[in-house]
């Protein structure tokens, strides 16, 4: 059986985000159309499907690096802030966005909260492995 480790990250995230939007019906909160993904960004995302792309990326991170918490995810998705003439500094990503995505996965039972952070459940693992198998057959 094909796993997440056997397919490229870009293809997996693209296919998973499409599936989360169309089949799983992962809902984007109303406030998400107005927010930036972090303090280091100057504008909100241009891609209208950014919520599902970020969700797919977070799910892959939990699969590969779990258990992983919100703090570590904020660091992974953070970036350099442009401070004008002053030197740029690293800023962490938005915690609200990541917490909301993780809560959505918990309600779908794709992840489970532990003492050390979120881990992928067997249901979430089989979901991602199924998408990986579908990508590998193409």
Q: Where is each model-derived feature located?
A:
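Short, amphipathic alpha-helical interaction segments positioned at domain boundaries
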Residues: 122-138
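Residue-level detection of the helix-turn-helix DNA-binding "recognition helix"
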Residues: 78, 103, 129, 133
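A short, conserved structural fragment
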Residues: 102-116
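Charge-enriched amphipathic alpha-helical scaffolds
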Residues: 54-57, 91-102, 106
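Short acidic, hydrophobic short linear motifs in intrinsically disordered regions
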Residues: 67-89
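Long, low-complexity, charged/polar intrinsically disordered regions in eukaryotic proteins
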Residues: 1-56, 60
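Short amphipathic alpha-helical elements of helix-turn-helix/winged-helix folds
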Residues: 58-65, 76
């Amino acid at each position: 059986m094909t796993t997440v480790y056997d397919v490229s990250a870009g293809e997996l995230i693209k296919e998973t985000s499409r599936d989360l939007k169309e089949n799983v019906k992962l809902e984007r909160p109303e406030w998400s159309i107005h927010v930036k993904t972090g303090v280091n960004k100057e504008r909100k995302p241009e891609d209208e499907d950014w919520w599902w792309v970020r969700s797919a990326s977070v799910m892959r991170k939990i699969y590969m690096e779990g258990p992983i918490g919100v703090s570590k995810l904020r660091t992974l998705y953070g970036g350099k802030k442009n401070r004008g003439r002053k030197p740029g500094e690293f800023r962490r990503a938005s915690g609200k966005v990541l917490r909301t995505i993780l809560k959505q996965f918990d309600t779908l039972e794709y992840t489970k909260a532990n003492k050390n952070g979120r881990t992928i459940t067997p249901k979430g693992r089989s979901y991602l492995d199924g998408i990986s198998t579908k990508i590998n057959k193409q």
